[in-house]
């Protein structure tokens, strides 16, 4: 989820009521059966068979031996759409590691140092939660990349992704507190074309994906508050391929430069150099790919998607260093436009502020809604569809009040100039004592 560079003023919240739409059949949150898996079933037999002809009346009936019940095996493959629990696919509850990369130069010793390895082992549960979330992310996005096509509505895409995430981690988030255990780390970002980030369809949204669209898909998955933040871009017209390649290469460069004692401003310079080496030809015009300079990567803290450190994607004088134990989202945004975004459009993303003040709320609807937010999301970002899903209605006045009182932060869509195209790629990386681990790395990107 994008971190916006600080601005002097926040755009005024603008929201509107809309009716809830029903998701496309087959994308609901009910657990689906994996039709590709062989399941063992119990044999059923008659308790007894009739006496043989000629047998004496009252003779004891012969009984067949009851066969022992066969134990049902754990699934060995994922269903389509994904509904098999990740914990069933990995019954030992040890989840796959991400891409481990050894440190270089003065930090090379860390890979084999006994003290650092001991420190690493102390955080195995923390790492395993992250790997659990990362595996759910990989399997969800694999389905999304395979199935999302022009003609799908953004609402169906969002429901398909979010239903999959909840099913894979085993928490539907409909009971009080359930979504705080595992599930969505933030609302799925589905930002089209010149919109770079923070767009998610509200109820009643009728937008449909078109053949010439460039779609940023930003998915957050958490387990026990440990959030994997990773994004990719889909384009169905090959003319946008260089734009996507620029962002993917720039993100990989940022990951390469990341590590203990790496200076954030210098990482931004490396990212910028790679990004600007790409060009895109559209309608006879050639555009240098520009990094969107007021969007940044960021640290991730438990239940807090935007920690205190920012990773610029252009060179800066920021001398802040990455440190052992940090978790970073390394993300880059490229644009054929101005390379600068502003807030515009209907708001869908919100989050309770970590430093939310204690305010005497006058509106009863605001008090009631804050109670719902505390019990279901805490400080995790949420969207209006998530409130709809919990059965909340007529909450906009209360939500506006919470925003106005500084209790809840709103995140409007972030857009470059109209007619331009933007792309995004992002990974989450753990700065471990011994190695750096790109926790969300997959075969796709």
Swiss-Prot record:
GO terms for molecular function: initiator methionyl aminopeptidase activity; metal ion binding; metalloaminopeptidase activity. Binds 2 divalent metal cations per subunit. Has a high-affinity and a low affinity metal-binding site. The true nature of the physiological cofactor is under debate. The enzyme is active with cobalt, zinc, manganese or divalent iron ions. Most likely, methionine aminopeptidases function as mononuclear Fe(2+)-metalloproteases under physiological conditions, and the catalytically relevant metal-binding site has been assigned to the histidine-containing high-affinity site. Residues 60-74 have a biased composition (Basic residues). It comes from the Eukaryota. It is found in: Cytoplasm. Its EC number is 3.4.11.18. GO terms for cellular component: cytoplasm. It holds the Pfam family Peptidase_M24. Keywords: Aminopeptidase, Cytoplasm, Hydrolase, Metal-binding, Protease. A divalent metal cation 1 binds at residues 218, 229, 426. Substrate binds at residues 198, 306. It catalyses: Release of N-terminal amino acids, preferentially methionine, from peptides and arylamides. It is an enzyme of class 3 (hydrolase). InterPro entries: Creatinase/aminopeptidase-like, Met_Aminopeptidase_Type2, Pept_M24, Pept_M24_MAP, Pept_M24A_MAP2, Pept_M24A_MAP2_BS, WH-like_DNA-bd_sf, WH_DNA-bd_sf. Its cofactor is Co(2+); Zn(2+); Mn(2+); Fe(2+). A divalent metal cation 2 binds at residues 229, 298, 331, 426. Its main location: cytoplasm. One of its GO terms (biological process) is proteolysis. Belongs to the peptidase M24A family. Methionine aminopeptidase eukaryotic type 2 subfamily. HAMAP family: MetAP_2_euk. This is Methionine aminopeptidase 2.
